[in-house]
Amino acid sequence: MDVILNFFSKEFDLPIVSLKLFDTFGVNDKRNKVLNYIKKKYIKNQLIDLTPGNQYLDLVNINDVCNLIFIVSNEILKKKIKGFKIFTANPKKPIKLKNLIKKLNNILDTKLKVKFGKRSYRKNEQFFYIKKNCNHPKWKIKNRIEKDLKQFFNI
């Protein structure tokens, strides 16, 4: 996709930005993602079947992503971005799923009922931290994961 975007940027002299998003989440997120699955089971006080939990998650609140889009949009409007650019929304703080569960158990009123190893890993799981990223220089994560998780779980 980036090859096509780069072509159009050069061919028509357009500022085009490709944003690479990681594990996004937010209060009204209804997608079939691991945090929503955990939340649904937590609310129902049910057993949560998970993988062994060694994969990494790069959790980014959707509000931080919106802030990045705002920054990039402003720079395009002010003609500060020329050509084709790639930016990531990488929090640079990956967390293993099993450590996320520990963090949630410290935050939540009731401990999660988790069975690790009950599910298989998916093909595209991330088992090592990808250091290569190109976050926009003016973009920083404003939200704190503990605060965001409390909001996400409505506590």
Task: Label every model-predicted segment.
Residues 31-39, 124:
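A glycine/serine/threonine-rich, flexible loop-to-helix segment
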Residues 2, 35, 66-69:
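A general structural signal for well-ordered alpha-helical packing
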Residues 1-8, 38, 100-104:
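Hydrophobic alpha-helix immediately C-terminal to the catalytic Tyr-X-X-X-Lys motif of short-chain
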Residues 42-155:
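C-terminal substrate-binding subdomain of Rossmann-fold SDR/epimerase-dehydratase oxidoreductases
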Residues 1, 31, 97:
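Conserved donor sugar-nucleotide recognition element shared by glycan-biosynthetic enzymes
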Residues 1-17, 43:
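Active-site Tyr-X1-5-Lys
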Residues 17-34:
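Flexible, glycine-rich beta-alpha linker
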